[in-house]
């Protein structure tokens, strides 16, 4: 099996077709999730006043909705786009309430189960059409991604080194890929992580795409050659390995880690609220059942602890931190936890501006960019702010496609255009790092 997806590559490695068949046909690879989303809806609302916002907050609490955006009920305010996943039974109550109060709404997804099953059907079809090579235009399970990592580690020794920095709560290895020409004892580095929130599948898809493009174009693209010769990229394709696996086997829209709380039945911590920077302040929840639960203490999650330890150890050489999320079409930089201007604002803002301009040049997709607190919302305890506060001067968070039409169910047909445009943005940021700011 060709793990670079290019039959002309001389360094490609092949595995028996039966290996891929087993991975496609094994339980959990394409899952109906026990019909758990039958009749569920995704509804968009934009409150036109603070009174409407307060009314929505109250009923969201009562109905225990799953907010797709924003990530917390506390963020619901006048003019804020609110995408709500709600069960079939609760949707009747919500729709009756909206009609009674004359709050405008739009149903984005009429039957979530059908949307999920359609996603799974397309996955199976696309995988079967490409048994001869690793397909970068489909979503892959954790097992597939780990096999991909190990194979590139064996077949690309001049550019790739894969290693583990620890284990997850459920005991899974936390794999990192070091990507770059092994030419110097000391090189500056860029950190890239994807999949800190389990349901955001486009993130891990981009991490894989980035690696493929870097390896395939290293000898032909002067910019890529310069990047890999002068920098190491530390890439974590799946940050939240337990949650990502769970999103493939049990709950497609799971967000958090899978750790247990001794006092509550609810599981998991928001891995992007668990960092030691204004921990559990605004935009985070202290309740274990909330999607933005900050955890019992900073770095309580072994996944967060392992990455924080690695970044601390290498912070003198790591000059950029890039984290990939979905969805909103934004490029964000610090601060998230406060309304303030970072000291190197002009340099970071220029890099962000050039990146979104480059991104837009590919398919015309518009991204907003700016400080996270002003562009998205105030949130505390996140990885981007932590990286910046710990001496990494370029810290960015991408919110990839789309803006809500598909939400977390971004179709596989949009993986390639999303990754192609994002690739250009990342190259722009990296080249700016090499040319401009220290």
Swiss-Prot record:
Keywords: Carboxypeptidase, Cleavage on pair of basic residues, Disulfide bond, Extracellular matrix, Glycoprotein, Hydrolase, Metal-binding, Metalloprotease, Protease, Secreted, Signal, Zinc, Zymogen
Annotated Zn(2+) binding sites: 197, 200, 325
InterPro entries: M14A-like_propep, M14A_act_pep, Peptidase_M14
Cofactor binding remark: Binds 1 zinc ion per subunit.
Major location category of this protein: secreted
Cysteine disulfide links: 266-289
Name of the featured protein: Carboxypeptidase A6
């Amino acid at each position: 099996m060709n793990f670079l997806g290019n039959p002309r590559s001389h360094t490609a490695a092949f595995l028996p077709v039966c290996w891929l068949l087993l991975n496609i046909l094994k339980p959990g690879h394409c899952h109906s999730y026990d019909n758990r989303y039958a009749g569920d809806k995704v509804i968009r609302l934009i409150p036109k006043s603070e009174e409407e916002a307060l009314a929505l907050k109250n009923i969201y609490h009562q109905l225990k909705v799953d907010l797709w955006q924003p990530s917390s009920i506390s963020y619901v305010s006048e003019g804020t786009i609110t995408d709500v996943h709600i069960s079939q039974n609760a949707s009747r109550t919500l729709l009756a309430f909206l009609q009674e109060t004359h709050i405008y709404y739009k149903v984005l997804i009429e039957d979530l189960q059908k949307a999920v099953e359609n996603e799974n059907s397309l996955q199976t079809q696309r995988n079967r059409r490409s048994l001869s090579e690793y397909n970068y235009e489909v979503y892959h399970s954790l097992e597939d991604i780990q096999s991909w990592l190990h194979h590139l580690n064996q077949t690309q020794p001049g550019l790739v080194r894969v290693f583990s920095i620890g284990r997850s709560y459920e005991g899974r290895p936390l794999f990192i890929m070091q990507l770059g020409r092994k030419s110097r004892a000391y090189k500056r580095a860029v950190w890239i992580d994807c999949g800190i929130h389990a349901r955001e599948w486009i993130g891990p898809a981009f991490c894989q795409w980035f690696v493929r493009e870097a390896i395939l174009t290293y000898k032909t693209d002067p910019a890529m050659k310069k990047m890999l010769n002068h920098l190491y990229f530390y890439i974590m394709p799946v940050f939240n390995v337990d949650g990502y696996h769970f999103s493939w086997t049990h709950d497609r829209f799971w967000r958090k880690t899978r750790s247990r709380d001794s006092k509550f039945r609810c599981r998991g911590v928001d891995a992007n609220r668990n960092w030691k920077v204004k921990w559990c302040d605004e935009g985070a929840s202290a309740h274990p059942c909330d999607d933005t639960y900050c955890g019992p203490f900073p770095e309580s999650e072994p996944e967060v602890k392992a990455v924080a330890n690695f970044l601390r150890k290498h912070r003198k050489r790591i000059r950029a931190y890039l984290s990939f999320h979905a969805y909103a079409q934004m490029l964000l930089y610090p601060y998230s936890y406060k309304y303030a201007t970072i000291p190197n604002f002009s340099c970071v803002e220029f890099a962000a501006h050039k990146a979104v301009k480059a991104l837009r040049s590919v398919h015309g997709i518009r991204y907003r960019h700016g400080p996270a607190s002003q562009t998205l919302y105030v949130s505390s305890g996140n990885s981007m702010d932590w990286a910046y506060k710990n001496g990494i001067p370029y810290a960015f968070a991408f919110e990839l496609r789309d803006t809500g039409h598909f939400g977390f169910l971004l179709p596989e047909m949009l993986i390639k255009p999303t990754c192609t445009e994002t690739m250009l943005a990342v190259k722009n940021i990296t080249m700016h790092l090499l040319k401009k700011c220290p």
